[in-house]
Design a protein with these regions (language model features):
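Structured mid-domain segments that build the active-site/substrate or prosthetic-cofactor binding neighborhood
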Residues: 103-109, 115-204
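Gly/Pro-rich turn-and-neighbor structural signature
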Residues: 2-123
Length: 204
């Protein structure tokens, strides 16, 4: 899975999948990382990775334009600057204005980036990708809801107030250990004003 040394095969993999799902209602995730939740292969420095990602975005949107809708700006799309991809984004990666930027937490419950006024004004808007379960480096938390519901509430309220309102995605892993955090997140996504009015203690 290497767009530097194996681009034709990777492109065909993407193309085949886009053709398979073109008639369905989808949100297409743009971009590329590596295998096993790691950084992309074939590009070592942030500058090299940025150049590859720019090519990836162009080629992926070309596929969407070809197989889904000639007006690519009308297709729901998301770009997720997760982990090392945030460094590439901060190095000046240009993401098309119609693409939703999905910001992430640091795997400990704290959101790493809030949209600037310029990012808030984007046509694609802003979203969040948040974890209540995590498998990966530096360590995992899979079987216990390990952080306070008040932290989740505080971070989601902050996200909403700073313009992260287009799309909320929650990584839940196994449902049972984090049932309450999941319920709180979904209730805030559905009607944040009601949760804010009653407070977390009453919501519990």
């Amino acid at each position: 899975y290497d767009y530097v040394n194996n681009a034709p095969a990777v492109y065909k993999f993407w193309e085949d999948r886009v053709k398979e799902v073109a008639g369905q209602e989808n949100i297409y995730t743009l971009g590329m990382r590596g295998v096993h939740d790691g950084q992309m292969q074939g590009a070592k420095t942030v500058v090299e990775q940025k150049a590859v990602l720019e090519r990836v975005l162009k080629d992926q949107r070309g596929l969407l334009e070809k197989y889904v809708n000639k007006d690519v700006t009308a297709i729901p799309q998301a770009f997720i600057p997760y982990k090392e991809v945030l460094d590439i984004y901060n190095a000046g990666l240009k993401v098309p204005d119609d693409v939703t930027l999905i910001w992430c937490d640091d795997n400990y419950g704290y959101i790493r980036h809030f949209p600037t006024p310029e990012e808030q004004a984007r046509k694609g808007g802003n979203g969040i990708y948040y974890h209540v379960s995590y498998w990966g480096r530096p360590h995992d938390y899979l079987w216990l809801g390990t952080f306070s519901p008040y932290l989740l509430y505080q971070q989601m309220k902050l996200a909403y107030d700073r313009g992260i309102q287009k799309m909320w995605v929650l990584n839940v892993g196994d449902i049972k250990p984090a049932e309450y955090q999941i319920e709180l997140f979904l209730d805030m996504a559905w009607n944040i004003e009601q949760v804010v009015e009653e407070g977390v203690t009453a919501h519990l």
